[in-house]
Amino acid sequence: MKGLENLGLENIGQVFHNLSYDELLKHEKNNNEGVCTKNGTFSVDTGIFTGRSPKDKYFVKQDPSQKYIAWGKINQAISEELFEKLLVKAKKQLSNSDIYIQDAYCGASLKSRKAVRFVTQIAWQAHFVKNMFIRPKEEELSGFKPDFVVYNACKCVNEDYEKDGLNSEVFVIFNIEKNIAVIGGTWYGGEMKKGIFSMMNYWLPLENKLPMHCSANVGEKGDVALFFGLSGTGKTTLSTDPKRRLIGDDEHGWDDEGVFNFEGGCYAKCINLDPQSEPEIYGAIKQNALLENVVLKDDLSVDFNNGSKTENTRVSYPIEHILNHEPSLSAGHPSNIIFLSADAFGVLPPVSKLSKEQAMYYFLSGYTAKVAGTERGITEPVATFSACFGEVFLPLHPTVYAKLLGEKISKHNVNVYLVNTGWSGGAYGVGKRMSIKATRACINAILDGSIQNCEFENYDLFNLAVPKELAGVESKLLNPINTWEDKKAYEETKLKLAKMFIENFKRYEDVKEGAEFKLAGPAI
């Protein structure tokens, strides 16, 4: 293959370059990398790491990128010297062996996409890359020039990590100036997916384009909707709609031409997967898909309800496995943006219409609430705030992304809504989870535009515009005060959540945008 000498590897055995799905399956079987399930889907275990290792992620601190990066717990700095040392170690691991090289694009927009080359010793990791990124056409492969190279030396660990001042023997390092990432010590496939997402979150804003952690779909009339939300808020479920084509389920960009998927596949959670409630995802698990960390029954079928290896069981598959997908992986500018929050305190309305300033506030807040682990006997919900609904993937300051979103909302006259997929009638333990039927009715009213004709009332403290009536939703559900029996507990809980929002937003007080958008939040 062309460009092999540029990789800096020595005494390479065979190079398996851009293998087909059938070839990859053959290698996976021959290498004993996993098991073929009853229906022909290959299944692998990712070892001790069944999720990402955010504490082991670093950026090389150097010019010019160091002046743009928001350094801290999320974006940790590493020296050029230490990067070079670990890169040499990783290259040594990848040398003197057979290697798999997979070339792919990140970004469906020809103007915005990046060409990425992945180098690994493991066939299933090449398979994962083939599923998750955009597969180049035959003619594109012949002249493929990578913008970025990922060395995945998952078999290699850094025994000197304590001496080096690092968190563990695992390392995931990005050198922006050299256009290289190096991974060591973890086999988890999601490091490659989210690693390149982090890089897109660095590159695109510098070109005045917005990278987003959201799902997207498009209606028959070409109207585009974006769904932002943290894990467990219903992003994948609600954007998978038989009446609308799926653009993508997780990572998108928004440039002057519209919205485009970064990926060519989906990475869905499998735990408790039910063919009745999520038939599209269930149907996508077939040959060419790749299962991770699932438990198999004696007949080699998947036990989706078994989380004994991890709750984070996953499947990656090419987006073509979803019948109702948008083949171009792109569409025009959004008509509607929906922020999903699973509010376990039970005080956010099922649906609220946001002003542009409120959109900035709730985007920067990135709120959801998780239900605490029952093993400690705790029934109190835990508030989670993750800027832009994906803070762990943002190399730049969150206000950079918020500012870009605000400009695009104004320019394209986009409607923005906050939808609570969490609790109603009381907090977790007292109230009930919002039914999917009621949430779908709220989403449908947003997408068909009928919510625009509603009469709205002000939801005090949060100052949110809430519809008085909405087709398909019981009217008393629309304002949380009507659903709580204990009005005193309601007022106390509402105030408590408002204070949490205010406390979290103090982190933005040192920047101009923070002081400006703060006024759109709860007012005590």
UniProtKB/Swiss-Prot annotation:
Quick one: which pathway? Carbohydrate biosynthesis; gluconeogenesis
Give the CC-aspect GO terms.
cytosol
Q: Got any disulfides in this one, which pairs? A: none
InterPro entries attached here?
PEP_carboxykinase_ATP, PEP_carboxykinase_C, PEP_carboxykinase_N, PEPCK_ATP_CS
Q: Which cofactors are reported in the record for this sequence?
A: Mn(2+)
Residue numbers binding substrate:
R52, Y188, K194, R314
Catalysed reactions, semicolon-separated: oxaloacetate + ATP = phosphoenolpyruvate + ADP + CO2
Sites where the protein binds ATP = K194, H213, G229, L230, S231, G232, T233, G234, K235, T236, T237, E278, R314, T439
Supply the Pfam families for this chain.
PEPCK_ATP (PF01293)
GO terms of molecular function: ATP binding; metal ion binding; phosphoenolpyruvate carboxykinase (ATP) activity
Q: Where does Mn(2+) bind?
A: K194, H213, D250
Please name the CDD domains in this protein's record. Answer: PEPCK_ATP
Gene3D superfamilies assigned: 3.90.228.20, Phosphoenolpyruvate Carboxykinase, domain 1, Phosphoenolpyruvate Carboxykinase, domain 2
Write down the superkingdom of origin.
Bacteria
Q: Which UniProt keywords apply?
A: ATP-binding, Cytoplasm, Decarboxylase, Gluconeogenesis, Lyase, Manganese, Metal-binding, Nucleotide-binding
Enzyme Commission identifier(s): 4.1.1.49
Q: How is the cofactor bound?
A: Binds 1 Mn(2+) ion per subunit.
**Location(s), subcellular:** Cytoplasm
Q: Which GO terms describe its biological process?
A: gluconeogenesis
Instruction: Report the sequence similarity comment from the record.
Output: Belongs to the phosphoenolpyruvate carboxykinase (ATP) family.
Instruction: Report the protein's function.
Output: Involved in the gluconeogenesis. Catalyzes the conversion of oxaloacetate (OAA) to phosphoenolpyruvate (PEP) through direct phosphoryl transfer between the nucleoside triphosphate and OAA.
Give the HAMAP family listed for this entry: PEPCK_ATP (MF_00453)
Please give the name of this protein. Answer: Phosphoenolpyruvate carboxykinase (ATP)
Q: Which organism is it from?
A: Campylobacter lari (strain RM2100 / D67 / ATCC BAA-1060)
